[in-house]
Amino acid sequence: MNPVASTSALNLARSLYEAGIRNEAVLRAVANTPREQFLEPALGHKAYENTALPIGQGQTISQPYIVARMTEIILQNKPSKVLEIGTGSGYQAAVLAQLVPQLCTVERIKSLQIQARQRLKKLDLHNVAFKYGDGWQGWPSKGPYDAIMVTAAASSVPEALVAQLADGGVLVIPVGELSQQLLKLTRVGNQFTSEVIENVRFVPLVSGELA
């Protein structure tokens, strides 16, 4: 990163600490990730604001706080293999890839998937497998997963994703339509516990693929 972006990213990480993010590894990953590279140049001046921003195709790059919060939750069970549903700009994947050994990410919009792949390659993040496909279906052939993160709101918890969780695995997902809650589901054998983390607002998780 250039010095200005580096300072801005560090300031963003500090603001996330003040907002309640306590995992130092997550804060370092945010500070090391050039968020402006995941946006159109016209929005670059807003890159280090703690806000969601449009990335085209009706999608957004998530608010840095929620990126950090969901990552913090995922890391609680020290996952080796993580599935991300909704690659989007690739920013969340870039943060995760610095913190977990293996990341698999699925995106239904082809143009976004191509851009995200290029961005992560440019950042020399090579522990990420990309799939163009329907996020509702996950990526069964790569599973099971220690953790699954969904970056769009589902009307209900997709059964296909639950089935791809390893024993002890965690699914973090926003659920709801107009009003959404961030849920943490933990698998213990064939049983699941559910915990409400906080109220959130995400774009909807849409089924199918879009070229």
UniProtKB/Swiss-Prot annotation:
Subcellular location, record wording: Cytoplasm
| Coiled-coil zones | none
Q: Name one GO cellular component term.
A: cytoplasm
Q: Which reaction does it catalyse?
A: [protein]-L-isoaspartate + S-adenosyl-L-methionine = [protein]-L-isoaspartate alpha-methyl ester + S-adenosyl-L-homocysteine
| Origin superkingdom | Bacteria
Record Gene3D superfamilies: Vaccinia Virus protein VP39
Its lineage reads: Bacteria, Pseudomonadati, Pseudomonadota, Gammaproteobacteria, Alteromonadales
What's the protein called, per UniProt?
Protein-L-isoaspartate O-methyltransferase
- Quote the EC number: 2.1.1.77
Similarity comment: family membership: Belongs to the methyltransferase superfamily. L-isoaspartyl/D-aspartyl protein methyltransferase family.
Q: Name one GO biological process term.
A: protein modification process
